[in-house]
Amino acid sequence: MIDIKKHYYNMGNEDINMMLFGDLHYSDKFNDKKLDLIYNKLKNSEYIFIAGDLLDSTDVVNNIDKRDKLIKFLEKVSKKSKVFITLGNHDLAIRNKHKKAKDDNNEFWLEVSRIDGIFLSRYNNYYEDDKIIVYLLEQDYDYYYKNKHESRELL
């Protein structure tokens, strides 16, 4: 159970420019020109929220060219904006011939979390400035996969 406490803050009357997107599903087959289109949509936002499934599968983590392009995209975006990333089920699991295997891409996400301006749910899940307060939540691997398989066995 998640305990949510109510907090009330007077953050001022300034406008906040933020964007939310999710389910990019970046993969080996992803057309990288789309990253430029996405950047052009995001570049004027102060805060960007990526709500899971940035990756299609963690296979892209092992493709050095694709991995580097995604890292460079995140670095470029985070130079202009604060970027908050919550990991989704595709970000956590490695697909291998239509089967899911336990998460082992921690090195990639640790690298992402070290980019200035990036806040990743796994490593730095709280952010506050004079305009916004952010709490990032992330479900663990078992939430997506273990429980799903156990419930199928009950049927």
Residue ranges, per PLM feature:
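A generic local structural motif
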Residues: 5-7, 34-37, 70-72, 151-155
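Binuclear metal-dependent hydrolase catalytic cores centered on His/Asp/Glu-rich metal-binding motifs
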Residues: 118, 130-155
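Structural motif
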Residues: 16-18, 46-47, 132-134
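Short acidic-hydrophobic surface loop/beta-edge motif
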Residues: 5-9, 124-130
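Active-site beta-loop-alpha junctions enriched in small/polar residues
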Residues: 24-25, 90, 137-141
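Core catalytic region of metal-dependent phosphoesterases/phosphodiesterases
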Residues: 26-128
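Acidic, histidine-bearing metal-coordination/catalytic regions of metal-dependent phosphoesterases
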Residues: 1-30
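Short hydrophobic segments within beta-strands
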Residues: 21, 51, 86, 135-137
